[in-house]
Amino acid sequence: LKYTDDTYQAMDKEKQNRGYFVSFCIEQYKKKPLRTGGIARDWSFGYTPLLSRFAQNISVRVSGGAMATKLAAHEEALGQMLKIFGSGGRQNITLVGADGAGKSTVVSAFAEMLIDGHQGVPRSLLYQQVFMLDASSLISVAAGRGELENLVTMILNEAFLSKNVILCLDNAQLFFEEGVGSVDLSNVLLPILEAGNLRMILTMDDQRFLQISQMKPQLAHALNTIAIQPSTEA
């Protein structure tokens, strides 16, 4: 099933911009024949067409120490992440901090530890790959709430079935409130976070997180939060 880069490049700009490609992906995904014999071989080998189209594979970028991402100031946060994901509890982490505090840096450092098999990484996390989705980008390509809900649901399903993906939702606050440039998808995301079976990292602005927590205490209760403080290192 090919509906990623080749299909996208073949479409004219008008169709790309108005979300036609998202609708096309959804329809083709639904038509994909169901294979028997357990999890399809595609999935067991990490077949992730939607993630490949809409997300960045952070692990590929940082593998082999390609990026100097780890800062001493973030070692405690990284240790907490390993502990949470290595335990049997809810498999989600929310990195909370101000803009520029280093949330994305922490995600990159964590991805590097896993993909390069650093000492201290639990066996269950070794070589897991971190894919980052930007909430604002997803909102911009979907034609409406229904299409966005379908797209996010299928991406979550794809990540879960791949068995080797940790999904990072950057600027996640945009998915938990209504407003300009944001859409409340709590009805989609909250059950996933509460179940805790899909490993997810959320990054959220600290002030927006506080506001959302007050409005949605059930959501706040479902999240394992880690505060990220700005680094003073040069």
Say what each PLM segment does.
Residues 1-139, 147-155, 159-162, 166-174, ...:
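Histone-fold recognition with a strong bias for associated Lys/Arg-rich disordered tails
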Residues 140-141, 231:
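Structural beta->alpha junctions
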Residues 228-234:
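Conserved small helical "lid"/interfacial subdomain of P-loop NTPases
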Residues 206-207, 233:
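Alpha-helix N-cap/helix-start and coil->helix boundary motif
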Residues 192:
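Conserved helix-to-beta-strand junction in the class I
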